[in-house]
Amino acid sequence: MAASCEGVFDGIYDEGAGSDTEVKAGQLYIDATSWNDWYYVDLDSLLELTDKGDVAALQQAQTKFTPWPIPQTENADAARDSSGMYIYWFDIFGKGMSYYERRGYKPTAPQPEPEHWTFAVHRDNVRTNGGSVFETSYTSMEELPASASSFVDKTFTADTWSERDVWVDRTEMLNCIMGNQGIKINQVLSSWLVFNIPPIPPTYTFNNHVFILRTKDGEYFALQLANYTDSKGTTCYLTINYRKIAL
Amino acid sequence: MSHTSLFTTLALAALPLGTFAVEPADSLLTGNDLEQVVVTGTRSPKLLMETPVLTQVISHADIEKADATNLKDLLQQVMPGVEFSFAQNQMVHLNFSGFGGQSVLILVDGERLAGETMDDVDFTRLSMDNVDHIEIVKGAASALYGSNANGGVINIITKQAAKKLNACLDARRAKHNEQRYGLALQGGSSRWSNAFNMTHTTQDNYDVHSDDGAVARTVTTIFGDHTWNFADKALWQPSDRLKLTGRAGYFFRQVKRSEESPERYRDFSAGGKALWTLSDNDVLEGSYSFDQYDKSTWLKSQKIDTRNYSNVQNSVRLLYNHTFGDNVLTAGADYLYDYLSNNKLDAVHRQQSADVFAQLDWKLNRRWEFVGALRYDYFSDHHIQRLTPKLSVRHTPVDHLNVRFGYGMGFRAPTLKEKYYDFDMIGIWTITGNPLLKPEVSHNFNLSVEYVKGNYGFVVAGYCNRVTNKITSGNPYYASATETMPRLPYVNIDRLYVAGFEATARARWSCGVDARLSYAFVDEQAGHKDGQKLASPYLPARKHTLTAHADWTHRFSTLLDGMVALDGRFLSGIDNQEFKNYYKVEEGTITVHYPAYTLWKLSAQMSIGKHLKLIFAVDNLLNYRPKYYYLNSPVVDGTNMMAGCKIRL
């Protein structure tokens, strides 16, 4: 009777199932919910920790990431029409996001970044550090070939300039106006999670294909978005599988 | 038959609060609605023609003819002054003669429903497959029903199982792959009966297209869903003076808005009721009701079902009716435990509420009848208390003519959501609860004249409502200079006036023609004393609405019944003032025009023998499509053909 006062059949839901932050080796868990920060991942340093066998340090490095704020303060000295906030109107409630108008620009300092990094995430956006990406048809890391040689002749896509994708300033969102960071992002790797708006509230399209990241140093890494929510269903908690592929 | 024994008979037939109603004969040909027993207006069984509180009845025959799937389909087809629109996320919002969903109390067999979205109950859970009839009382009725009975009460009375074992299967298909399947099993003996109903519906998403030049938000895709609805009701009558009923239900809906992460809605309900006829003069009823409404998101690829909302209501009710002479004394008490868990609230909240009420139905003579009621309600959260009175008078100056007058006070206690909401709506604004909200209070005056003789019936009813402290979402504001996201608070607004009248004419001829024409006028004025404008997301009531129905029913032979029906509704256009810029209210408003529209439906039903009925319909006969699919525009995209059948075994 007492239980029924506050509900029955709790068991049919997956509330609180497991721990969000415990990941296995070769897996990242990033709280990328912030609209104002990038989170950088250095895969080389993670592999070093793996090789050392320092389980605690690896767990920490795979789940704790430092936010790198997106500059939003106007900086007149910044190069015009490069780094900065780009104000766009989108026809969110009409014909959709492919209809837009540029409404303004505010120069800001460039995006700060750490000395060593491989890729970075901001909600559904991904950048690489001078790398390029190829999308495979594999949906499991185990299916991948042991050598990267089979990917060498594939077409890899480098990061490209974007001023409408990295949504930052939402203060005029209801008026369909968004402040976006002007920055290079990797459109192929970013396709692992697509933020659809309309409808309101937005929906997400999730692509669990394995992507191959070729770094500027010629290394190959396999990356796969395994999940994009926490156990309570909050979006932009990213679980990412990673693995280095030798040539 | 003495009045006392008449009362007892009615009580046993209908049960106070309409636990069961007797299933009508399986025929398109039905008797006179005036013999219908109604319970909603007085919480005691009364003949429709004699009740001092004007009660509109949507009969079982009306429901059958409408072939409606749920309450929304039915009300918008047969009731004037009713319109449904979309809230955010395409949740359905009701405007019921100037009152929104939270101010109209919707009951099933007298029991409240848990759960709400954007102020309205989930209308898809109110399936019509097991409904005997619906009683509608307009105007404030908080003296009998407590909070939320501000603008009226809609009481859905479910069927009582037939004693004879039978089964019924039905199916219907329509546009956008809309499918409906139903199963009904019932049976029993002289002392018990059981009815089981199941309904499954599904509909695909579909796109709608607006012209260029929209000045308000438009919808581009209408989201389909699929639902499952199960209900079982058992009756056991161990003696002539005692009836025990039990029920259980399960509802599931999955909206097809997102392929990856569809939203799910579930409801678990159960209850028991005992009706004990202590003597020819005394009837006691006790009931317990459980209702749990959950919302969750199904993360398909991860196979995770995460719940983000649960509203659980446990209620206990006692109702006692004592007759003396022609008079009835009614007394009752209710207790409700309300639990709300919502990830958009600051925390889990609980509230207990209790009430006591009494009513005297004094029948001076056959020409005059007076009903007076008084109720005290208590809510534990912030210790809200209300005392609400009600007075109704029926005068029958000449036979067949009833004049009814009523005054009722209504109130709506702020919900836990309205007090404690804290929801970042994807950065648009934070919807913020207000623990200091006052209860919304209304004063309703109504006057009606009803004339029914032979095959003809006419009703004219006027009403006016003065509402103070209406609870609604207010204008957006910034809590501080450093906040970048506005807050959208819940507020009390100073005043709401809703006045209007309705006129209905109905005729039935022995040749099998049944016709009904209803007109409703509603004038709704809301605002602050200082003239400050409101950013209400919902359209006010349209001033003029007209509904028309005509059908011809004919028995061609002992094996063949047929019916052809035409239903139409007209709603006048309306201009609504909406903010140009929700972030800068000072920029003023623009006028958004919602044009008049009319929708017509032609349907035909054919019963072949005892076992088969075929149903065809062409809805939106005139192929109406709104120029702009605003949230408050009718969701139709042209003519819709429907075909179905019902097999009875």
Give the positions of each predicted feature:
Chain A
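Surface-exposed, beta-sheet-biased, low-hydrophobicity segments with strongly acidic/polar composition
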Residues: 6-247
